[in-house]
């Protein structure tokens, strides 16, 4: 339903597909948010989103939470070296018009260190299977930039 739901949303049309996607997001997020401790309701993709909220250019261009989190998923998969999964998400993002590179969210390589610093200031990766560092985030974002240039 995702592709049609997004197209319907952009066309300001309420359809069964859009309704089902919205309900799925609200129900799953609501359940997770209420059944687990706060440290487990977020992760690295959200940390990356939070990092980008510190950029004036990202805020001024009104990028949606889910758009930037979808980019954060690419960063997460790059850090974890899950390249096959990254390729699937990358192709999905491209097909849906979701961000795959910095310029898609009005950011530049000069912004990356600031994003990484802010990403680590919240609770998002406070309890994580491994320590996440600024350099890991910076390196993953720059690797994604290279991947975009090659694809």
Predicted regions: what they are:
Residues 82-151:
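C-terminal charged capping/lid subdomain of soluble metabolic enzymes
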Residues 1-92:
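Active-site segments that bind and position negatively charged phosphate/pyrophosphate groups
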């Amino acid at each position: 339903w995702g592709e049609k739901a997004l197209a319907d949303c952009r066309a300001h049309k309420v359809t069964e597909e859009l309704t089902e996607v919205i309900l799925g997001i609200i129900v799953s997020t609501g359940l997770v948010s209420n059944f687990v401790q706060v440290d487990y309701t977020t992760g690295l993709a959200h940390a990356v989103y939070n990092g980008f909220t510190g950029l004036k250019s990202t805020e001024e261009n009104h990028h949606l939470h889910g758009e930037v989190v979808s980019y954060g998923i690419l960063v997460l998969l790059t850090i974890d070296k899950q390249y096959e999964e990254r390729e699937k998400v990358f192709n999905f993002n491209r097909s849906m018009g979701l961000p795959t590179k910095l310029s898609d969210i009005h950011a530049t390589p000069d912004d990356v260190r600031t994003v990484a610093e802010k990403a680590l200031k919240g609770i998002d990766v406070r309890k994580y299977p491994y320590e996440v560092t600024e350099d890991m985030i910076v390196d993953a974002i720059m690797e994604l930039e290279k991947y975009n240039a090659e694809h």
